[in-house]
């Protein structure tokens, strides 16, 4: 992520005060673990695989993707941050513990996002 942040000139954007604050990002993946780097910024969660109410990630990929987008870097003293560390995140679990899923679950997830725009 750090190399990508350099390649896309994140620091120049940050110096203008743009951090992603006020922007909501939906991540349709394997779920999300409420990691220190994502603390207080996960604003919504829906599970179309096991229908659980509380956020979880039984694979790790969804958490990794969310951190690449909006991780604060808090667990590593700011060293590894996402590209938009101020954004809000909505996690929609549409993939199972192996990373497999159904197109119908992805479509259900997209519909859920559309009907919960207030989180974004």
Language-model segments: residues:
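Autoinhibitory propeptides
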Residues: 1-16
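Short, well-ordered amphipathic alpha-helical segments that serve as non-catalytic structural scaffolds
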Residues: 5-8, 72, 107-110
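Short acidic, glycine-rich surface-loop motifs adjacent to enzyme active sites
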Residues: 110-120
